[in-house]
Amino acid sequence: MSDGRTGAGEHDARTAALDRLVARMVGAGPLRFTVAEGDDERDLAYRLRHDAVLSRGWASADELDGGREHDAFDPAAVHVLGWDGTTAVCAGRLVLPPGPLPTEEACELVVEPRGQVVDVGRMVVAPSHQDANHGTFVLLLGGLYLEVRRRGFGVACGMMSAPVRAMCRQLGCRVELLGPDRPYWHEVRAPVRFEVGRDAAGLVERWGDDEELSER
């Protein structure tokens, strides 16, 4: 098992190639990704989450906070926003160590390596940008991946539904199940762990081109 935080000596060619591949994929897409700065941009993430919860029937408006969905982890979290022009259309959240992380708290477990894991969650896409191919959601995953890597981490965890786990498998990305499915954030999800270096070679072979392969 590798350390969660990756230094220069551990940032091997395969992982670097995957980082470049994801950066190119996200950069070629129609969205721009940023980290929310200030209360106004955080509020955009909370409102996107609110709208997602309502549209899926997970909660009623009376159960939510004035058009916002948020919890105790949000003030210290990193919120990643995806923009279509000047409109925020998707969002996700990173809760940084040392923890306890949301997944650890919900499932009463510790994700190893302790204190070196980023919790990825609260991923939502505006109804206007949802489609059968889940293109915006895949780009959001890429934007969150890049932010995790930018902060020097190589291991992530989260609560993931069975359909999203299946999507990850189709993309060639293995997620390690840490426990059984259970109700979490209005849906049945299971705790999972993802290690960057584990699948880097296979992902680059599958989705990369000659540039990535030659630079490995």
Regions found by a protein language model. Give the residues of each.
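Short, P/G- and charge-enriched loop/turn segments at secondary-structure junctions
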Residues: 66-70, 106-109
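Conserved beta-strand in the GNAT
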Residues: 81, 86-96
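Acyl-donor binding region in acyl/amide transferases
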Residues: 105-194, 198
